[in-house]
From Swiss-Prot:
Native species: Mycosarcoma maydis (Corn smut fungus)
Annotated family: Belongs to the SEC23/SEC24 family. SEC24 subfamily.
One BP annotation, GO: intracellular protein transport
Gene expressing this chain: SEC24
Location of the protein in the cell: Cytoplasm; Cytoplasmic vesicle, COPII-coated vesicle membrane; Endoplasmic reticulum membrane; Golgi apparatus membrane
Protein name, UniProt field: Protein transport protein SEC24
Subunit structure: The COPII coat is composed of at least 5 proteins: the SEC23/24 complex, the SEC13/31 complex, and the protein SAR1. Golgi apparatus membrane; Peripheral membrane protein; Cytoplasmic side.
Superkingdom assignment: Eukaryota
InterPro entries: ADF-H/Gelsolin-like_dom_sf, Gelsolin-like_dom, Gelsolin-like_dom_sf, Sec23/24_helical_dom, Sec23/24_helical_dom_sf, Sec23/24_trunk_dom, Sec23_24_beta_S, SEC23_SEC24_subfamily
Residues annotated for Zn(2+) binding in this entry: C323, C326, C345, C348
Membrane disposition: Peripheral membrane protein
SMART domains to which the protein is assigned, alphabetical: WW
Biological role stated in the UniProt entry: Component of the coat protein complex II (COPII) which promotes the formation of transport vesicles from the endoplasmic reticulum (ER). The coat has two main functions, the physical deformation of the endoplasmic reticulum membrane into vesicles and the selection of cargo molecules.
Pfam families: Gelsolin (PF00626), Sec23_BS (PF08033), Sec23_helical (PF04815), Sec23_trunk (PF04811), WW (PF00397), zf-Sec23_Sec24 (PF04810)
Gene Ontology cellular-component terms listed: COPII vesicle coat; endoplasmic reticulum exit site; endoplasmic reticulum membrane; Golgi membrane
Length: 995
């Protein structure tokens, strides 16, 4: 049986060497290393030899030599720049006993030795964990001492002084959106104040290493050290929009918190993140900070090779170790005891037996290395579940399409576009084992079933007009195996677009169609995909047009955002019990009651898509819907799922947000789990936490389309603290804003929109007031400044963006359908997509840098510099791009030169340019190619099925389109909403008034 990690002598830490795939032991006081665990001895005492050589690779190949050195203050261990006389990768042996000492450098150098670095150029082991890739490639060294460091995105070295043919001089370019900034990436040292020179002696060197974040990764180090609190004044200061792309505060766990030194042993923020990366030990401290404690999770984040994503490791031997008391799954934060025969749970501290086959490789029938098991090295892992995790065998993927065939739907081209998209996507449906089943039902004031048999190629239409007691004609031929009946399915889809071209029926019996689909697939479960362009008007679930312009912008507007019929609340609960999910694709020539119909996906784990004023005659509409519909159809299915959160004793989940049904106090039922769907869980501290760190474990038990029952486990470990300053220094403003968006939507539906807006502003006032009274010298007195921790400096900007968002904004001109759909997005978009949806990206295109819009070797695709969201950036001759992930606007100034119009839009001048929804032409000139590349990059860079529309907005063009684009410039005053500077002034006055 594998042995647990040895207890290290004082002054030694274990680090992970990814090249050797094993641990290396580092003496932090001297820098010497060893492959073998050090023996106990006086801390910090070096062996008799002058220099210690780096241990030999386990396979006998010499890795590199490493003289005993003292790194300069502020550097991350030995990850330093190479000296010129040694090429990258050249190992340097330690100097011989009689060799001269290195030359001194700088004033006072005679009292300090120089820092040899050449031997660290190629394969330097970073004291933050593993090999430092940036150093190996000759990049600059990241260090935690740059006080006001900005994200290190690409910027051309020399500004182009050649005037742009379209206006002012070129701007510098920044890295593409969606790419993580280099400094402070997850698991790397964060940005903090520059540490001073440490005191002399071994203790001084130790302090240097602590300041550099040594051991501050997953496994801890010499001592637990939290992110440094940096207070900034945001009053009168323009927000730095690039801060929104910075990673959350670094998670710094105490030493020996983790059984593995693998840097992936803690959850990536894209899977699971917490509003606080240092959890208060008491409820009183949490409440005093006014920061909500919550988790933001996206358990099925899409894996994209283009982004460097790695697939989730899978444990295939069905050996699953769980705590016998709290049922926690074994993870990197448990403790092995009794010579590795038992493990102590990190949640409830009870000891459990290690399974007999835990150290056995079932494929080779040989003993296995315990420390290589995925569940002990990775924060996100999947287990193939044995039979005891199955109520029934995993069912096949089932797709039931309810397609509106009324006059409105046929006339808009929706029916033909949907049929063509399904036909083209049949080969991409999850059907690897040929078990997928499909059913198509047409809906107007009657139900149109299609009987398909394996032998025939011509489907039979069966019409049912009795809506009060729906029955299924030929039920065995309605839901058919896709592989066996492929010819009949294709024949139906090819004819469907023309079958109803002469129909004049205008009603919709959607409720009866839903009941029929449920009756058909409830024994199996599966997906009901509704495509409708009509308001349900007859039969069960019939709705009336309740849009009342007089209610918009009033206290009664919230009545338009809840379900209008109880049918749409009770029916999805029945679906959830039978593992049936509903996806809604809504096409709106007029009022569709999105608020009511979106209840179906909300309680069944589905998705809502909305296409206002859809008409397939516009190529842009057809392409957007076809792309999004096919992406949803082709995405891997995780169905028959339940989600549960477990946390360290003393922490309890109190509220849940997202698309699911709460089956019990802590169990969420999800008939399907879409890719890139977001969920939020609020937590509270019930009792004092005595542990040095806490663990949150999210578990999703689900079935795959290939017939496997799997368990996805996501672990997040966070240190605890009793210090208010450490609570603020470790707050994650992105996670906080995501949770506040969920709470605001819920408040607006169950109370009033005004209450939701007030709650957002009051939460901001509470946080700033508490920070001012506890963390600043101003205390309770009035102050002209507005102080907050640097990592929370953009929280007011995000709250203002939420207050100005179409889902929450005070306005009498926002149709309830648009507001309801925006709220559906606010509660389901993962944080990486939600923040751009709240705070749009703004670029100047007419004078962007020469490299912007192109792919540069070793730099990737280069985007223009991001601008603050204010119309002050507009120039009358300019071309600008504003995008929020759902729509892209090209703003064209009224004095745009003819050459710009010709190069980009292929029109002679501004006067002949038409505004509105469009597709850019592809021309043979650099400017057009770069703008097209930027638009395509924006569409491709974010996860999820969405394809944003592109609009041309002329400065003096259509007023409604112009106001729509301007509403995204949240730093400006808009309608009743204040500008950013006015908002900060109101916040400062409120904070001073309440002090």
């Amino acid at each position: 049986m594998a042995q647990p990690p040895p207890q290290l002598p004082p002054g030694w830490v274990a680090q992970w060497d990814p090249n050797a795939a094993r641990q290396v032991f580092v003496e932090t006081a001297t820098g010497r290393t060893s492959w073998q665990p050090p023996t106990a001895g006086p801390a910090g005492v070096a062996p008799p030899q002058q220099h210690q050589q780096r241990p030999t690779h386990p396979q006998g190949q010499a890795r590199m030599s490493m003289p005993q050195i003292q790194p300069p203050p502020g550097m991350r261990g030995p990850s330093l720049s190479p000296i010129s006389q040694h090429g990258p990768g050249a190992p340097v042996s330690p100097p011989s006993a009689g060799s001269p000492a290195p030359a001194s450098i700088g004033p006072g150098a005679s009292r300090r030795r120089a820092y040899p670095t050449a031997h660290l150029a190629a394969n330097s082991i970073s004291y933050a964990g593993g090999y430092d890739a940036s150093t190996a490639t000759g990049a600059g060294v990241a260090y935690p001492g740059a006080q006001d460091a900005q994200p290190q995105l690409f910027t051309p070295g020399a500004p182009d002084l050649t005037p742009s043919p379209y206006g002012a001089a070129a701007q510098p370019a920044l890295g593409a959106p969606g790419l993580a900034p280099a400094p402070g990436a997850h698991g790397a040292p964060g940005v903090g104040p520059a540490p001073g020179y440490a005191a002399g002696g071994v203790q001084g060197i130790t302090n240097q290493f602590q300041a550099m974040g040594v051991g501050g990764g997953v496994a801890g180090g010499m001592g637990q050290k939290f992110s440094t609190l940096q207070t900034v004044n945001i009053s009168g200061v323009q927000p730095n929009v690039n801060d929104l792309e910075r990673p959350p505060p670094e998670i710094r766990l105490p030493p020996n918190a983790c059984v593995s030194t693998n840097p992936k042993a803690n959850a990536d923020p894209s899977y699971q993140r917490c509003t606080l990366n240092a959890v208060p030990t008491t409820s009183s401290l949490l409440q005093k900070s006014k920061i909500p404690l919550g988790l933001i999770l996206s358990p099925y984040r899409s894996v994209r090779e283009a982004d460097g994503d790695e697939p989730v490791p899978v444990v295939t031997d069905t050996v699953i170790a769980r705590c016998r008391r709290c049922r926690t799954y074994i993870n990197p934060y448990v403790t092995f005891i009794e010579n590795g025969n038992r493990w102590k749970c990190c949640m409830c501290n009870i000891s459990n037996e290690v399974p007999q086959l835990f150290d056995w490789n079932s494929e080779t029938n040989q003993p296995a290395d315990r420390w290589q098991r995925p569940e002990l090295n990775h924060s996100v892992v999947e287990f193939i579940a044995p039979r005891e995790y199955m109520v029934r065998p995993p069912q096949p993927p089932v797709y039931t399409f309810l397609i509106d065939v009324s006059y409105q739907a046929v006339n808009s081209g929706m029916v033909a576009t949907a049929a063509r998209t399904i036909l083209e996507t049949l080969d991409r449906l999850p059907n690897s084992d040929n078990r997928a089943k499909i059913c198509i039902i047409g809906v107007d004031t009657s139900l149109h079933f299609f009987s398909i048999t394996p032998e025939g190629t011509e489907p039979d239409m069966l019409v049912v007009s009795d809506l009060d007691d729906v029955f299924l004609p030929k039920p065995n031929d309605l839901l058919v195996n896709l592989t066996e009946c492929r010819a009949g399915v294709e024949a139906l889809l090819q004819r469907l677009g023309d079958m109803y071209k002469d129909s004049l029926v205008t009603g919709s019996a959607l409720g009866a169609a839903l009941q029929a689909a449920y009756k058909l697939i409830s024994p199996i479960g599966g997906k009901i995909m509704v495509l409708t362009a009509s308001l349900p008007s007859v039969g069960p679930g019939a709705l009336k047009n309740r849009e009342d312009p007089k209610l918009l912008g009033t206290a009664k507007e919230s009545t338009l955002l809840g379900a209008a019929s109880s049918f749409y609340k009770t029916f999805p609960i029945d679906c959830s019990r039978s593992q049936v999910s509903v996806d809604m694709f809504l096409f709106a020539p007029s009022y569709t009651d999105v608020a009511t119909l979106s209840c179906l996906p909300r309680y069944t784990g589905g998705q809502t898509f909305f296409y206002p004023a859809f008409h397939a005659g516009r190529a842009e509409d057809a392409v957007k819907f076809s792309h999004e519909f096919s992406e949803v159809l082709a995405s891997p299915i995780s169905y028959e799922a339940v989600l549960r959160l477990r946390a360290t004793k003393g922490i309890r989940a109190t509220a849940f947000h997202g698309n699911f049904f709460v089956r019990s106090t802590d169990l969420l039922a999800l008939p399907s789990v879409p890719l890139d769907q977001n969920y939020a869980i609020e937590c509270e501290i019930e009792e004092t936490i005595n542990a040095p760190f806490v663990v949150f474990q999210s578990v999703v038990l689900h079935s795959t389309s290939s017939g496997e029952r799997r368990i996805r486990v996501i672990n997040l470990a966070l240190p605890t603290t009793s210090s208010m300053s450490e609570v603020y220094a470790n707050a994650d403003q992105i996670a906080i804003a995501t949770l506040l968006a969920d709470k605001a939507v819920e408040r607006s539906i169950h109370s009033r929109l005004e209450d939701a807006r007030d709650a957002l502003f009051n939460k901001l006032v509470d946080v700033f007031s508490t920070y001012k009274s506890t963390m600043t010298s101003a205390g309770s007195g009035a102050s002209p400044q507005l102080a907050i921790a640097q990592n929370l400096a953009q929280l007011p900007l995000l709250v203002l963006a939420l207050l100005k968002h179409v889902g929450i904004r005070q306005s009498s001109s926002i149709p309830s359908d648009l507001r309801a759909y925006a709220q559906a997005l606010l509660t389901t978009l993962p944080a990486q997509q939600l923040i751009p949806y709240l705070h749009a990206s703004f670029y100047c295109l007419h004078n962007m840098a020469p490299e912007a819009g192109t792919t540069v070797a070793e730099k990737g695709f280069v985007m223009p510099a991001k601008l603050n969201l204010t119309s002050e950036r507009f120039e009358r001759h300019g071309l600008y791009l504003i995008e929020d992930g759902q729509n892209i606007f090209l703003w064209v100034g009224r004095e745009a030169v003819p050459q710009l119009c010709l190069d980009v839009f292929d029109v002679a001048n501004y006067g002949t340019l038409r505004g509105g929804k469009t597709t850019l032409p592809k021309l043979d000139n650099s400017m057009n190619q770069r703008v097209n590349a930027i638009v395509q990059r924006i569409r491709d860079s974010r996860r999820g099925p969405y394809r944003p529309h592109l609009y041309i907005v002329k400065e003096d063009g259509e007023p409604s389109l112009r106001l729509w684009a301007l509403s995204l410039l949240i730093e400006d005053r808009f309608e009743q909403s204040p500008s950013y500077m006015q908002f900060i002034g109101q916040l400062r006055d409120k904070v001073n008034g309440g002090s």
